[in-house]
Amino acid sequence: MLTQLKTYPKLLKHYEEIKEMHMRDWFSKDKERASRYFVQFESLSLDYSKNRLNDTTLKLLFELARDCSLKEKIEAMFKGEKINTTEKRAVLHTALRSLNDTEILLDNMEVLKSVRSVLKRMRAFSDSVRSGKRLGYTNQVITDIVNIGIGGSDLGALMVCTALKRYAHPRLKMHFVSNVDGTQILDVLEKLNPASTLFIVASKTFSTQETLTNALTARKWFVERSGDEKHIAKHFVAVSTNKEAVQQFGIDEHNMFEFWDFVGGRYSLWSAIGLSIMIYLGKKNFNALLKGAYLMDEHFKNAPFESNLPVLMGLIGVWYINFFKSKSHLIAPYDQYLRHFPKFIQQLDMESNGKRISKKGETIPYDTCPVVWGDMGINAQHAFFQLLHQGTHLIPIDFIASLDKKPNAKGHHEILFSNVLAQAQAFMKGKSYEEAFGELLSKGLEKDEAKDLAHHRVFFGNRPSNILLLEKISPSNMGALVALYEHKVFVQGVIWDINSFDQWGVELGKELAVPILQELEGHKSNAFFDSSTKHLIELYKNYNQ
């Protein structure tokens, strides 16, 4: 456990020594701070100079990582050891993008051979749709693709397809359906022509309630309009491991793409779950996405901790969570294409590390994953940055931006990028009472009025942030960015001694929903309901009589 590691008391002592120090003083005394706390990897760079740390902090954090045998645990994951201890599974999302030739054997299975076999089938299918060779039941080309999934079967593909829209096939439109609220599926179907629509149903078991409900609604809509169930074979494909259920649905087994239990949903966009990505962007761009992630994997495995991006970000996060007692972390991308990135990271981070039980089954006496949230930074400035600047919470921020200007939008990117740098500087530097008072006097306010108002114009500063810069939003850079956050999450899970690869927390609500659904549908359930739940069930039933 973290609190039992030999470096932990050293970090506690160090925290007491520097907790009142201000970053603006460090910057004024150390002209090399920005260059020393800057790491470049391929087309991605991290400026972590605006954090409440110094060389001693970093030295102790790296020592903490070594106390946890982080290097050995990284190697264990890549080798396919069953580090998902509660489910007795390997964790091999990295194998999905591996360019190595050294085979990984898992329970007599050749992992890379299996992965590449599925990728080959995905490429052939993608090519057939993009080229127009695969036609619908009236011999029309496919123009619209609807991905039906939820959680990891939705968020990753949605995020990547949105981020890389500039690389998409000009004929194809992507639609994502995840919410079991019928409004979403009906709104999507309303726009579509069944003769030119391809549905991808993504569910490992092919029994996920939300996904199957939406898929059956899509199936009913399609059959009613096409006039014959046999046409399903040309318009529905599945990403699943349940061949029998897929065939019962009407999908040809040759149009089923498998994935494996060594890949968790939130880590699965690199697998057949990414079929929608490959069709939309093409195999060349999908390969570049995989390669970018692979290069980050190699960096994570091989770079020393001192220049290792996932290690640095993971340890800096631990520093705030476990010593500054920060409860929250903000993801602020300054790019319209990255608008779904915060909610993707929400799932990745909170579903992985939102745990309170150690790998040994003991209750953990310290904080783990913070609440992760975010929005596009430029919009957020006009919404909740007020709280970040002058509120009572310490909320570390990841600013994410690209250097590449958008064509045909002169001046826009300079304004956008200036705000990234200005906000990060403002959070670090702040504004003193004396500065605020002087500004108000210079604007002509009376001295007494300026004295009172100046209190409201003070920015304490010392608010930490990372700045992640991509040269441009490209397939390879997106691959590297996602893999960076995957590995950051892994680092923190190791430090906290938790299993980052199960998600038992999603199960209880699903179990309890079963008897409630029976009651709502007019069937009697033997389940016991608390008085509040019972009252609300009756309220619903009475309204819908």
UniProtKB/Swiss-Prot annotation:
Pathway: Carbohydrate biosynthesis; gluconeogenesis; Carbohydrate degradation; glycolysis; D-glyceraldehyde 3-phosphate and glycerone phosphate from D-glucose: step 2/4. It is an enzyme of class 5 (isomerase). This is Glucose-6-phosphate isomerase. It catalyses: alpha-D-glucose 6-phosphate = beta-D-fructose 6-phosphate. The keyword Isomerase applies. GO terms for cellular component: cytosol. The gene is pgi. Keywords: Cytoplasm, Gluconeogenesis, Glycolysis, Isomerase. The active site is at E351 (proton donor), H382, K510. Its EC number is 5.3.1.9.
